[in-house]
Amino acid sequence: MDPYKHRPSSGSNSTFWTTNSGAPVWNNNSALTVGERGPILLEDYHLIEKLAQFDRERIPERVVHARGASAKGFFEVTHDISHLTCADFLRAPGVQTPVIVRFSTVVHERGSPETLRDPRGFAVKFYTREGNFDLVGNNMPVFFIRDGMKFPDMVHAFKPSPKTNMQENWRIVDFFSHHPESLHMFSFLFDDVGIPLNYRHMEGFGVNTYTLINKDGKPHLVKFHWKPTCGVKCLLDDEAVTVGGTCHSHATKDLTDSIAAGNYPEWKLYIQTIDPDHEDRFDFDPLDVTKTWPEDIIPLQPVGRMVLNKNIDNFFAENEQLAFCPAIIVPGIHYSDDKLLQTRIFSYADTQRHRLGPNYLMLPVNAPKCAYHNNHHDGSMNFMHRDEEVNYFPSRFDAARHAEKVPIPPRVLTGCREKCVIDKENNFKQAGERYRSFDPARQDRFLQRWVDALSDPRITHELRGIWISYWSQCDASLGQKLASRLNLKPNM
């Protein structure tokens, strides 16, 4: 074996203790001192190495989605959609692709309870024959904002106050009072689904609009949906308090224990598609991430199933170092002009480079399983063995060539450079429809959560009035009930 091409792993552990460089360690219990009670000597390299390594064990926490759990498995195509996409891993029923999935909470820190009211991340990395595909979504089909320009401000509002280091309702209510497009997302977050029972019993959504392209270059806008075969289950507020007080890692434990017991979680993948030529036929913009596509007019189409049948081997290597980015796509799947997706394309890779370093895609959990070739050389923590003489392109001494051209959306865009909001905002209709779909008891729980949120003493009379106005525009009875419980008059 060529030692220069050997990747270190626990599989090559020696039977005795060593330093990182392989030197034998005959005493891992005591520091080197002058005599039995004398001072420690600086020449105790093993002690210095051990402490220095310990001091650097932690890496920067994810700015969002810090708390998470991962598992591995496979995705299998069950229905032919080759007329919609030329993606190789979707080429025919029966095709299987290895995957790794990370579930997470969003706002709270790495050690926070998994029972807090918060969206849940649902990110899937497909290791395909044409490179990796990252489908990075949530357990709710919409989002709070439609323009990524507001993403840092939104996260700041949700995160703890810079003064008190506590999450405070008045900051959230204040920020989103300027963003009525958030009402639809809040109709999910303040609903029962705001606290999933665990990761196995929650849905997943790609959230953003993507584009499928077939072999003829025909594009279709697409939304991705994951449906758990064991059904959707949630925790009510009092149940969440009990569960969280018993085990703050209950969802991680449930996922790990279920897989270990052979009770493998499974999700069915569905898509919705819209012909770009028909995108103006709706009362919403299909690129607006705050909207769902009504399933009665844009039905779900089955694609495949995902089974998680293996727990990760190491939390740090396969969860903390696991990195997703919506920019990582494969031929046959492309981006759309969704404003939030466009900003995520940059931001996700940028934060991974900050967290893990410029060569984070070389880490085993992030590297593609297919062959790959480029001149992205060197940089911090580059551990790939390379012996090429040519590190430029093109060259007559290197046979590497361009890949075959793949179809991309043929759309021609024209327009003025401008910063503006979309024409079809329609901020209240879908939120109202969702509220009216609840049974009376569920409506009352939703209402009470908003009463509690707006009862924060820092929230002004003006802010309460704005939110009552917003919810009144979603549903008049909801606004009236909210005003009544807050002892205010609804002001449309």
Curated annotation (Swiss-Prot):
Keyword annotations from UniProtKB, A to Z: Glyoxysome, Heme, Hydrogen peroxide, Iron, Metal-binding, Oxidoreductase, Peroxidase, Peroxisome
Region (Disordered): 1-20
Residues the entry annotates as binding heme: Y348
Necessary cofactors: heme
Biased composition (Polar residues): 9-20
GO molecular function term, any single one: metal ion binding
Entry's localization field: Peroxisome; Glyoxysome
Gene3D superfamilies in the cross-refs: Catalase core domain
GO cellular component term of the entry, any: plasma membrane
EC number(s) recorded for this UniProt protein: 1.11.1.6
GO annotation (BP), single: response to heat
Annotated Pfam families: Catalase, Catalase-rel
Main location per the UniProt record: other
Active site: H65, N138
Entries under CDD domains matching the protein: catalase_clade_1
Enzyme class: oxidoreductase
InterPro entries: Catalase (IPR018028), Catalase_AS (IPR024708), Catalase_clade1/3 (IPR024711), Catalase_core (IPR011614), Catalase_haem_BS (IPR002226), Catalase_immune_responsive (IPR010582), Catalase_sf (IPR020835)
Family the entry assigns: Belongs to the catalase family.
Function: Occurs in almost all aerobically respiring organisms and serves to protect cells from the toxic effects of hydrogen peroxide.
Protein name, as recorded: Catalase isozyme B
Native source organism of the sequence: Oryza sativa subsp. indica
